[in-house]
């Protein structure tokens, strides 16, 4: 048996959904639109430090809230890029669109940003041990109470795939009130795909 996703495990306790809407009809279309919007934003702004995309819907409006460590990259000069994002999303949803960008204050303890950073370093042929240890040190320095980082695949170009992980501090996965952030990223290297998993214990 594998481990349960810490975010899904804590839904409605300390976490909430990233798509906040309900539909009796057209639920499937709405779900596909949400996936398409997130895919477009993550692909278009790979280097903008996108942490999460919250989508809220009403009858005549789709509101997209982008959490990013570098909001200026997404907004562009005088908000020019925001208008482009609105147009692209409006084409997908055929509805009025509102886009807001929120800055991530402590990117060093955001699991999504940590996993993406490690994956990007692995693609640039940085040693996986060095990338993992550097991420752990900066995370704990910023006030996280515990962190675990795991890398799986042909690490360092080895013939046989393996998993290596490092853990510092506490990580109470079965304590539901514990605020644990989790993320998964993939590094596409010349040896194959390396999976990166990150768990961050922020506190209760």
From Swiss-Prot:
Entry's Gene Ontology BP terms: translation
- Do the record's keywords include Protein biosynthesis? no
Q: Which residues form the KH type-2 domain?
A: 37-105
The alphabetical list of record keywords is:
Ribonucleoprotein, Ribosomal protein, RNA-binding, rRNA-binding
* Database matches in CDD domains: KH-II_30S_S3
Q: Which GO terms describe its cellular component?
A: cytosolic small ribosomal subunit
Q: What does this protein do?
A: Binds the lower part of the 30S subunit head. Binds mRNA in the 70S ribosome, positioning it for translation.
- Tell me which HAMAP family the record gives: Ribosomal_uS3_B (MF_01309_B)
Name it. Answer: Small ribosomal subunit protein uS3
Task: Give the organism the record lists.
Answer: Wolbachia pipientis wMel
């Amino acid at each position: 048996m594998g481990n349960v996703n810490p975010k899904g495990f804590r839904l409605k306790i300390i976490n909430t959904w990233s798509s906040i809407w309900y539909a009796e009809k057209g639920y499937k279309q709405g779900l596909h639109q949400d996936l398409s919007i997130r895919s477009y934003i993550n692909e278009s702004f790979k280097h903008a430090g996108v942490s999460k995309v919250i989508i809220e819907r009403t009858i005549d409006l789709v509101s997209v809230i982008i959490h990013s460590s570098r909001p200026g990259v997404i907004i562009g000069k005088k908000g020019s890029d925001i208008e482009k994002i609105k147009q692209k999303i409006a084409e997908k949803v055929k509805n009025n669109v509102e886009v807001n960008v929120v800055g991530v204050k402590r990117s060093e303890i955001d699991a999504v940003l940590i996993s993406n950073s490690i994956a990007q370093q692995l693609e640039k042929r940085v040693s996986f041990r060095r990338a993992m240890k550097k991420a752990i040190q900066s995370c704990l320095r910023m006030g996280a109470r515990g962190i675990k980082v795991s890398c799986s695949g042909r690490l360092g170009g080895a013939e046989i795939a393996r998993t290596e992980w490092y853990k510092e501090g506490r990580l109470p996965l079965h304590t539901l009130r514990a605020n644990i952030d989790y993320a998964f990223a993939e590094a596409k290297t010349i040896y194959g795909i390396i999976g990166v998993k990150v768990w961050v214990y922020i506190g209760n």
